[in-house]
Amino acid sequence: MKAERNIPYVLNYKPSEDDGTMFCDADYAGSHDSRSCSGMVCFLNGGPISWASKIQKLVSTSTCQSELISLAETVKEALHIRLLLEELGARPVGVPMRIHEDNSAALEMAMSDKHFSKAKHFKVRQSFVRENCRPLEEGLTPTATVIQTPTHLQLSDGLTKALSKDLFKVFQDAVTTTPLCIDTKEALLACTSSPVHWR
């Protein structure tokens, strides 16, 4: 995207029944010191309202562990966003957030009661995800539900690693960014209903 680096973009939102959908991913050992990179994005009303991309503090020894770290951080963000939106009246009270994860091993480790002898040092994260994503006592709902999603539909992929131009365009379209080809804020307000960023 070198040729477009100076083109500003806006985020577009539209009326939608989506009341909170999140995607999380991890790029295993992609940094120079073999640390993995976590990526997370949360969508509301057709556009992203929260996102993150950061190098993990721990060195993971497998893709599964790096994905579990990313999933645990996403659950923390889901808890915060859900409480905020409920307090603002922007989403129904008691409805779990939806988190999309593409790694089946991480999902099994996070949601199963099985004991994983080689993952004891990740047990706290495992327990945190399980506690917040499984049905609680009768009448209570979990913070979020985790859904296994095919890798090609993982919308946080662009937040974990560099993509080819074609894949980046797919990611860009997925997060509903639109080129801003006008000079004034007034024109911006006339062409999009909910601009949240310009430069």
Residue ranges and their predicted role:
Residues 12, 23, 43, 100, ...:
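Beta-strand cores of modular interaction/reader domains in eukaryotic scaffold and signaling proteins
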Residues 6-10, 27-29, 57, 84-85:
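Eukaryotic intrinsically disordered and solvent-exposed regulatory patches
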Residues 19, 54-199:
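RNase H-like nuclease module associated with reverse transcription
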Residues 15-17, 35-37, 92-94:
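Short gly/pro-enriched beta-turn/loop segments at secondary-structure junctions
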Residues 3-7, 48-51, 80, 84-87:
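Conserved helix-loop functional segments at active or binding sites
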Residues 19-64:
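RNase H-like nuclease fold core
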Residues 1-26, 90:
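Structured nucleic-acid-interacting core domains from mobile-element enzymes and related host factors
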